Structure formats: structure tokens, C-alpha cells
């Protein structure tokens, strides 16, 4: 139901809620800042009577732990994780890597790509290319 949520420095929280269907968030990503009329099912808040929130299990969901690590470290680390993740997911969808093997490749890519604390645009471009190359190399 919650597709995204952000908490601001003043403590306010904004969330994007919708049916458990990624078509609407993807449509918005492509049409931003405009809104396009769609025929997608609408979220009926009267039927959402019980939303529960739990502490994420980063031991069970290792990629989440890696994403948190990248977020807290900053610099070009989120770019490394994103690039490696895109490579492993594409490989997984073609049966080129196991589900559990994806985390290993992402973590090793994080270790092997040079960290840049304050990246410029060119650093991001180079980081993305290098992370993709290393992740693909680790898979093969």
C-alpha cells in the first residue's frame, strides 16, 4: 500500500499510497511533475483498516542492509549499489544468478569500486560503469 515514504528534518512524513501495483508509481515517475488520468484501481481507505509497521529484518533481507550501508556512507556508494543491483536483477531474471547470490555480488561490488566522498557528475558516470562491469564480471 505504501510505495514510498520520506521523513523530513522537522519530523513531518509524506507518503505515496496506492493499490499494491507498481504501474501508478512508475507512471508518475515518467510523467512528473504532471499527473495523468489512469484507469488503475483506486485505494479505498475504508478497506485499509489495519496498516502495520515492523522493524525491517536486515539479517533476513541482506540487500536492505546493504542499501542502508550505502545510504549512511553516502558519496557514490548508493550509485554503486544501484548499478550492481540492476545487473544482478537482470541476471537473476535470465536464471544467471541465484536469488541469494545477488547479495554477494552487490556486497563485493561495493568493496571493489573506489569510494568517492563528494562525487561530481563525471564521478557518478564512471562509478555506474565500473560497478556494472564489476558486477557482471563477478556473475560470470
Annotate each predicted stretch with a short phrase.
Residues 1-140:
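Catalytic, metal-anchored helix/loop core of enzyme active sites in primary metabolism
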Amino acid at each position: 500500500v505504501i510505495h514510498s515514504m520520506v521523513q523530513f528534518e522537522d519530523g513531518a512524513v509524506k507518503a505515496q499510497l496506492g493499490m499494491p501495483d507498481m504501474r501508478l508509481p512508475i507512471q508518475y515517475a515518467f510523467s512528473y511533475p504532471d499527473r495523468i488520468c489512469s484507469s488503475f484501481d483506486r485505494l479505498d481507505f475504508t478497506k485499509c483498516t489495519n496498516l502495520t509497521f515492523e522493524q525491517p529484518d536486515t539479517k533476513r533481507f541482506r540487500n536492505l542492509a546493504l542499501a542502508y550501508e550505502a545510504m549512511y556512507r553516502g558519496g557514490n556508494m548508493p550509485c554503486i549499489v544501484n548499478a550492481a543491483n540492476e545487473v544482478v536483477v537482470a541476471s537473476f531474471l535470465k536464471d544467471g544468478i541465484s536469488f541469494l547470490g545477488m547479495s554477494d555480488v552487490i556486497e563485493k561490488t561495493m568493496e571493489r569500486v573506489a569510494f568517492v566522498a563528494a562525487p561530481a557528475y563525471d564521478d557518478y558516470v564512471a562509478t555506474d560503469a565500473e560497478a556494472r562491469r564489476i558486477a557482471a564480471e563477478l556473475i560470470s
